[in-house]
Every structure is written in C-alpha cells, then in structure tokens.
Amino acid sequence: MGALGLQGRGGRPQGTGCLLLAVAGATSLVTLLLAVPITVLAVLALVPQEQGGLVMESAGLGAQAQQGLSKSNGLPSRLHSQIPSSSKNPFLRPGALSSHGKHPWVATLPPIVASTPVPGFQQLQEEKPETDLSSRLPAAHLIGAWMKGQGLSWEAKKEEAFLRSGTQFSGAEGLALPQDGLYYLYCNVGYRGRAPPSGAGPQDRSVTLRSSLYRAGGAYGRGAPELLLEGAETVTPVLDRAGRPQYRPLWYTSVGFGGLVQLRRGERVYVNISHPDMVDYRRGKTFFGAVMVGLVPSASLGKCLHSANV
C-alpha cells in the first residue's frame, strides 16, 4: 500500500495551507521591516526641504523689501547685489517664525540716506551764516578817569574802554569818527557830594548837575561847537520842621542820556560837565561812547534826533 498524505477537513491537504500561511507571515514581516527605514528616510528628506523653502521665502521677502527700499532711495541697480539677504545673516535662524506664527523674521539693513530728495518729504535747506557787521562798524567806549592837575579825563584802553574800526580819541580834541553815518551817542556821568555847610541860604541848598555832548570840526569849524545832547539832574535836600536841610553825609546821583545823531567824517564829539569836582570816578559810573548804526544820505547830514533823558 502506498503512503497516504495528510488531509484535513473537506479533503484538502494540510501541508499546502501551512506553506501559504508561512509565506504570508514572512511577507508581512519584510514589509514592516522595510517601511520603518523608508519612513525615516522620507522624513529626513522632507524636513530640510521644507526649512529650505522657508529660508528661500524669507530671502525672497527680504530681497523684495530691499529692492523697494533701494527704489525709494534712488539706489542704482548695481548696488542691489551688495546688500546681503537674510539667508546670509548670521543672526537670523533658518526657519524661525514670528510671534504670530505666520511669517518668518526678515533681517533688513538700516535705511540709507540718499542725497536726492524723496517725494512727499520736505528737505531742510542749509542755513548760510549771516555776515556779522558789528565787528566792522566804527564804535568807541570811553570811561572817566581822574587825572592830577586836570580833573576829569577819558581812558580809551583800560577796563571796558575800546576804540574800533578807525575811531580815534584825543583828550584835547575829543572823539573822532572815521566816516559819515548815523551814530548812537550815549553819556552817563556819576556825581556825588556832601551836605552844604550850615547857615547857607535857600538858594544854595539845591544843586543842578549838567552833562552835555558837543560836536566840533568838519563843516562846523574848530571854533563853532554845536550842542547835540544834554541831560540834567537837580539835587534838593529834605528840610526838617525847622527848615534846615537834612542831607546825609554823602549823596549820589547820575545824569545819563543818549540819542541818534547824523555825523560827518572829521567831526569830533566831546563831553562838557557842570561840576567836575563832584564827578564819581568809581567803576561803571562815568562813561560815554558812540556806535555807528547805519548809513544816511549826504543831503540829510547835520540833523539830530534827540532821545529823552534817562
């Protein structure tokens, strides 16, 4: 008798079913083993590509922003290649997203100030320095000084005194101005004195102090001075009930004035005072001077505009 094969239910041999089951199991195992590395490789291959896409997108946005900035500033096209993009910026992380999670950060350069004006903006014009004429205009400032045997004299080189732009001073002839023009003249004389002696009459109790500015020379001649400006001050004592003066041991006052005068070249200005023995020579008390403030027509020279007494 021959050998009989194994049969299962339905009359089918059991060896064929086991073989098919083994083949299916092996196929599933191989498929599972191959799927894992393929998946890993696919992930590794896709992730850099996406990040690179983000970087390229940020670079594209940065290039567009830089291109628009260069157009608004008037930069030539040859400078576009010199502007680094965000992909070359070491401070920008590739693929870094903004706080909103929508757009990546774009690194841009600070705006470049162009020499050409931008439409819609006002351009400040350079202010040219104004020419200072004060240093070239004739001017003088003299201070009072006491000189032994002469009394009041004028100092032109000490303390605040000065002569500028051709002005000259002589104690005998006065202040000479170098050119025709409109000048501002000023004078201030300080006075001080003591109470009058007791028993003096009423007419001797008041003292009127005068200071005057004269001009001479030029069209007026050496011996024909003309009064330009003058100021006066009267010192009157306060009387007590008995009618006696109540002077303090010393009294102080000053006479000051100034005004505009049209002067010609060669004319000289000098000061005349009524009580030279009462002049106060302390610093800042007695002085006079002149400063040119403008030009005037030659036909109107010789006129004087007086100002009120100070």
Curated annotation (Swiss-Prot):
Disulfide bonds: none annotated. Residues 67-86 are annotated as: Disordered. This is Lymphotoxin-beta. One of its GO terms (biological process) is immune response. Cytokine that binds to LTBR/TNFRSF3. May play a specific role in immune response regulation. Provides the membrane anchor for the attachment of the heterotrimeric complex to the cell surface. Residues 138-293 form the THD domain. Residues 49-310 are extracellular. Gene3D superfamilies: 2.60.120.40. Belongs to the tumor necrosis factor family. InterPro entries: TNF, TNF_C, TNF_dom, Tumour_necrosis_fac-like_dom. It is found in: Membrane. One of its GO terms (cellular component) is extracellular space. PROSITE patterns: THD_2. The keyword Cell wall biogenesis/degradation does not apply. Residues 1-27 are cytoplasmic. Heterotrimer of either two LTB and one LTA subunits or (less prevalent) two LTA and one LTB subunits. Its main location: membrane. Glycans are attached at N272. The keyword Transmembrane helix applies. Keywords: Cytokine, Glycoprotein, Membrane, Signal-anchor, Transmembrane, Transmembrane helix.
